[in-house]
A protein has these predicted regions:
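Catalytic, metal-anchored helix/loop core of enzyme active sites in primary metabolism
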Residues: 1-399
């Protein structure tokens, strides 16, 4: 690389953001960190700014931004500090940025992701919720603006790697008959159904293979993570929901498979470490080191696969239903899930009731066509209001 490319890391203090910085630190000739963005973790972002010396630091929370501004001024940093969601979107589309790591969890990352796409950036998409909520709008804008999307989710990144040479998400996946997403099964893969009601947030977040944030860890435990990934796969790779399968694979070594019309099946294997898909996306179409230890298949010995249990984990079927319905249904599903998961983490809702809340929201709110971003945001807000009302003590829903 002659001149390092400007990189914006939105969600830099989260798990994906921190892993991205680890990989980037190995390759200063490839990337210069131009923007660091987060919600309110100002102490963490200040430490990152001291090390990587970005042009701009953005914190959505105004108080956190003020704290960061003072701390960086005191240490002599020249980084500008701005606040608010609009500043985050502006940073994602700035002239000093060529590549955007979109890693802000949940609906909060939607506007900045859309801004990066609109500005024709290469977007490394770790925020699956943005695609689930506004997938048709997002992918249409990718094609219109000439942006590039490279998925960071280990499963979708694996599919991307197994696609024909030169393929980019949004293109027609010619010759592909099926993609298979693998799931570890989460911490409750072997748990008795009756025991799931009383599991704690800490138990749900104790993933057997991956180190992740708490929200995505709960999604993995309910298998909603895989449900969102089904929707994501239909949008990224232009496949109907019926051509996206799920297999439970406890070893988390095979990250996904792609089946072709001639009967061939290609799989991508690797250690369960997010630095691998991050490095692949950062270097694409080349390759560089991720810092991840090589996979020892002889040591692993066996690879097992089994179908998911839809009775114990109903979130998968709820997500498939939303994928088939289209329109605002995925946004309703995502919003209800975010509210229910947070209520579970706050100990206001039991584990098995997460799916119940989502189901009730989908039953009560009709899906409608998506013609503009406002349609998605209105559906998101309505689903959040209803989910909160259902969870509220005295609602009678869980009596």
């Amino acid at each position: 690389m002659s001149t390092p490319r400007g990189l914006a890391i939105l969600g830099s203090t989260g798990s994906i953001g921190r892993s991205t910085l680890e990989v980037v630190a190995l390759h200063p000739e490839w990337y210069r960190v131009a923007v660091l963005g987060a919600h309110r973790s100002w102490q963490s972002i200040v430490e990152q700014a001291k090390r990587f010396n970005p042009d701009l630091v953005v914190l959505v929370d105004p108080e956190a931004a003020a704290q960061a501004r003072a701390a960086l001024r005191d240490c002599g940093s020249t980084a500008r500090v701005e606040c608010g969601a609009e500043a985050l979107a502006a940073a994602a589309s700035g002239d000093n940025v060529q590549v955007v790591m979109a890693a802000i969890v949940g609906a909060a990352g939607l506007k900045s992701t859309l801004a990066a796409v609109h500005a024709a950036k290469r977007v490394l998409l770790a925020n699956k919720e943005a695609l689930v909520m506004a997938g048709t709008l997002l992918m249409d804008e990718v094609r219109r603006a000439g942006a590039e999307i490279i998925p960071i989710d280990s499963e979708h990144n694996a599919i991307f790697q197994c696609m024909p040479g030169g393929y980019l998400p949004g293109d027609v996946a010619r010759g592909v008959t099926r993609v298979i997403l693998t799931a570890s099964g989460g911490p409750f893969r072997c748990a008795d159904a009756g025991s799931l009601t009383n599991v704690t947030p800490d138990e749900a977040c104790a993933h057997p293979k991956w180190k992740m944030g708490r929200k995505i860890s709960v999604d993995s435990a309910t298998l909603m993570n895989k449900g969102l990934e089904i929707i994501e796969a239909t949008l990224l790779f232009g496949l109907p929901e019926t051509q996206v399968d799920v297999l439970v694979h406890p070893q988390s070594v095979v990250h996904s498979l792609v089946e072709y019309a001639d009967g061939s099946m290609l799989a991508q294997l690797g250690a369960p470490d997010m630095r691998t898909p991050i490095a692949q996306a950062l270097a694409w179409p080349a390759r560089f080191a991720s810092g991840v230890k090589s996979l020892n298949l002889a040591e692993i010995g066996q690879l097992a696969f089994e179908p998911p249990d839809h009775q114990r984990f109903p979130s998968l079927m709820l997500a498939r239903g939303a994928a088939r319905a289209g329109g605002t249904a995925p946004a309703l599903l995502n919003a209800a899930n975010e509210v229910a998961v947070q209520a579970f983490l706050d100990r206001r809702l039991n584990f098995t009731a997460i799916a119940t809340v989502i189901d009730r929201v989908l039953q009560r709110l009709d899906s409608s066509p998506v013609k503009a971003l406002s349609d998605v945001l209105d559906a998101d807000a309505a689903a959040r209001r209803l989910a909160e009302a259902l969870i509220e003590p005295g609602s009678g829903v869980f009596a």
